[in-house]
UniProtKB/Swiss-Prot annotation:
GO cellular component: nucleus
Keyword match Cell cycle: no
Function: Transcription factor that positively regulates the expression of the gene cluster that mediates the biosynthesis of an emodin derivative that may be involved in black Sigatoka disease of banana.
Polar residues bias locations: 96-107
Record feature DNA-binding region, as residue ranges: 36-63
Protein name: Transcription factor MYCFIDRAFT_198930
PROSITE patterns in UniProt: ZN2_CY6_FUNGAL_1, ZN2_CY6_FUNGAL_2
Localization terms from the record: Nucleus
Assigned keywords, A-Z: DNA-binding, Metal-binding, Nucleus, Transcription, Transcription regulation
Annotated organism of origin: Pseudocercospora fijiensis (strain CIRAD86) (Black leaf streak disease fungus)
Single GO biological process annotation from the record: aflatoxin biosynthetic process
Length: 442
């Protein structure tokens, strides 16, 4: 009995064809993105031209459109098609991995869409930065195409265009005029008054002078006796070298200056009138010596030295006031003379003659105060630092040699240093006011 083979149904022969056609139709339905990969990474609008957009064509970049991602599940044929596509696997093998990043954060090889003119050291991060700093303006110049040309045209010297103040500006800050530190209420109308204003100036000036006179008797120097106050060594580094060698003599020098300023009474018990030439020369030498002692490192730790230097400045200001007052008294006590007569109250260097001698003496003292103002400013900083060091000292109880050493290094209290600072500035201000008042009256 022969059996006749059954014919295959029509749908069976068409099954693989239908499957292949379905996969091809699925791949044909996949759409590309409207923006190329380069414009998408740069967050810029793409013209969408094929095969290369206007931006990539202008910059010489490889324009590539990737498949658009849709929401939902992926089609069944999408995964199998991608897995069976050898070109896709080969393209994925060139994708940057984590191991391909160098220690500096750059890729060791370029992306496939990079221009071949870019060297291998150029990273996509630099390319993205160049795209970010170049907006979508067709009038701008082309971006650099090599790693060596990728640089920001930024001049760092512009950050320092303001510069630092010159030495002349700093010196102008120190050389502030005497009228700048006083109240503008002192006008010419008050110059003729001899009431409470002048009494207030004299009282403020003589506060410390009375206390100093109890310790050191004030007596003018002898006209014929020239006291040498200039140190034997004028080298400004001598004090610093002596401190480094452990043989600092700043305190001894300060005490010697103080002894010379507090001169002994004149012979025969008669006080001779002060000599302007001698006083000004001696004060200038004293100020120079104090300035060099302030530059020494020992002035930062020695409270005794700062105290003695403060007393020296008090005496210098006192001698300036003495010579100005003495000249004014000589002018007031002289009877009226002819224009040919003159009153000489100066030495060979400063000749103050006639009725204007008091005004000239006040002007001379006022010009010398500028040098004292610089010293007072430097000494004020040292006194404040010493006061802060005293305040920062711990409150713990110390005994024996440790407590004795602490008292030797910080002999005075912080309040004492603050008071010396205040008194120095007050004394300098009072002397300046007095000289300005004399200039307005004469």
């Amino acid at each position: 009995m022969s059996t006749t083979p059954m014919a295959a149904p029509p749908g069976a022969d068409l099954k693989p064809v239908t499957s292949s056609r379905g996969r091809s139709s699925t791949s044909d339905e996949q759409k590309l993105r409207s923006s190329c990969e380069s414009c998408a990474q740069s967050k810029l609008k793409c013209s969408g031209d094929k095969p290369a957009c206007a931006r990539c064509a202008k910059r010489g970049l490889a324009c590539k459109y990737v498949i658009a991602k849709r929401g939902g599940r992926k089609p069944k044929g999408y995964t199998s098609t991608n897995d069976n596509n050898p070109s896709k696997r080969r393209e994925d093998s060139h994708s940057p991995a984590a191991s391909q990043w160098s220690s500096t954060g750059h890729l060791e090889q370029s992306y496939p869409y990079c221009d071949p003119t870019i060297s291998g050291s150029a990273s996509p991060a630099l390319i993205a930065m160049s795209d970010f700093y170049n907006p979508m303006d067709q009038n701008l110049p082309d971006a650099p195409t090599s790693h060596s040309d990728i640089s920001m045209d930024f001049d760092f010297n512009d950050c320092f265009s303001l510069g630092f103040p010159s030495s002349n500006e700093l010196s102008d800050f120190c050389n502030v005029g005497s009228t700048d530190m006083f109240s503008p209420s002192l006008d010419s109308s008050s110059s003729s008054s001899t009431g409470p204003e002048r009494q207030l100036l004299c009282d403020g000036f003589s506060l410390t002078d009375d206390a100093m006179s109890d310790l050191f008797p004030l007596s003018p120097p002898e006209p014929q006796q020239q006291i040498s106050c200039t140190p034997t060594d004028k080298n400004p580094h001598s004090y610093q070298e002596a401190c480094l060698n452990g043989s600092c003599s700043c305190l001894v020098e300060a005490l010697s200056l103080m002894k010379q300023l507090v001169s002994s009474p004149a012979r025969n018990g008669a006080a001779s009138p002060p000599n302007i030439q001698t006083i000004i020369d001696r004060n200038e030498a004293t100020i120079e010596s104090v300035r060099r002692m302030l530059e020494c490192s020992c002035s930062q730790d020695d409270g005794y030295l700062l105290s003695v230097m403060s007393l020296i400045i008090f005496r210098v200001l006192g001698w300036y006031a003495t010579v100005a007052r003495q000249t004014a008294c000589d002018v007031d006590s002289q009877p009226s003379r002819s224009p040919q007569s003159s009153i000489s109250s100066a030495g060979s260097g400063y000749c103050l003659e006639g009725a204007d001698s008091a005004r000239m003496a006040a002007q001379l003292v006022l010009s010398e105060i500028h040098h004292v103002r610089r010293i007072v400013h430097q000494l004020s900083l040292k006194l404040k630092a010493q006061g802060e060091k005293e305040r920062s000292r711990p409150e713990t109880r110390m005994e024996g040699l440790e407590a004795m050493d602490n008292e030797m290094t910080l002999p005075l209290s912080a309040t004492m240093y603050d008071q010396l600072d205040v008194d120095l500035k007050k004394r300098l201000r009072a002397l300046s006011w007095e000289m300005i008042d004399r200039l307005r009256r004469y």
